Amino acid sequence: MSGAGSKRKNVFIEKATKLFTTYDKMIVAEADFVGSSQLQKIRKSIRGIGAVLMGKKTMIRKVIRDLADSKPELDALNTYLKQNTCIIFCKDNIAEVKRVINTQRVGAPAKAGVFAPNDVIIPAGPTGMEPTQTSFLQDLKIATKINRGQIDIVNEVHIIKTGQKVGASEATLLQKLNIKPFTYGLEPKIIYDAGACYSPSISEEDLINKFKQGIFNIAAISLEIGYPTVASIPHSVMNAFKNLLAISFETSYTFDAAEKFKSAAAAAPVAAAPSAAAPAAAAKKVVVEEKKEESDDDMGMGLFD
């Protein structure tokens, strides 16, 4: 290795070591067909909230091995280091970095021999191609017609499917039509967070909900088996307080917090008494009136006996 090459290697190792020891959150992404200018734009976009490391996987793995004693959790990354791997280091804003990455995508022509990342459909309508090129389209089994001195495609054409290898004829046609069917950018494959790896499709909200559910499950199990944990202690304290309060109501034993509840309970019947008196008086009046009517009927019947 030349002196210049050795120097570049040492600079890369020093930079990578600093990044791996500074950050605990990372996005591991594939960088196929991502150019240097595009990568530079991504670096500029995330400046202040993250950093980008692009290099050979053998070099990155060497740095991870060298840090095995101080940061053994980094070994989880080795599984995801591929040929064209880019690592984006983040602070506490993975969602923002992912958003920036998604906006930094550029259109690209279809090149022969490339596997299509998405379907390619040519719409029906004018092509701008001269009638002399009709045979070229016919070889691709595309129905055409001549309209106003140019070739029109009769029906929509599904020319390339996802995962299909792009042929030379398809690539030439798309170039003639000035269609750039593919977009390329960094493709996040895994999120690394302090030794844990998960899919980039999982949002921070999903993680928070899972965390809450885990705490709930731990608390439930702890309460069931009577084994105190940080998650169950608040519930245990509340249950103990309720039991103590119940004992205070049934016995002469009391304490400051119980007195507040006792005072509230004692005031409740007093407040309800005036409202309860009115229905009782009304009911009494109805009973008296009914008895009075019965007495009148008896008196009337006696006059005609």
Swiss-Prot record:
Entry PTM: Phosphorylated.
TM spans (from-to): none
Single GO MF annotation: structural constituent of ribosome
Keywords annotated in UniProt: Phosphoprotein, Ribonucleoprotein, Ribosomal protein
Entries under Gene3D superfamilies matching the protein: 3.30.70.1730, 3.90.105.20
Positions in coiled-coil regions: none
InterPro entries documented for this protein: Ribosomal_protein_uL10 (IPR050323), Ribosomal_uL10 (IPR001790), Ribosomal_uL10-like_insert (IPR040637), Ribosomal_uL10-like_insert_sf (IPR043164), Ribosomal_uL10-like_sf (IPR043141), uL10_eukaryotes (IPR030670)
Similarity comment text for this entry: Belongs to the universal ribosomal protein uL10 family.
Record note on quaternary structure: P0 forms a pentameric complex by interaction with dimers of P1 and P2.
Descriptive protein name: Large ribosomal subunit protein uL10
Taxonomic source organism: Dictyostelium discoideum
Taxonomy of the source species: Eukaryota, Amoebozoa, Evosea, Eumycetozoa, Dictyostelia
Gene designation: rplp0
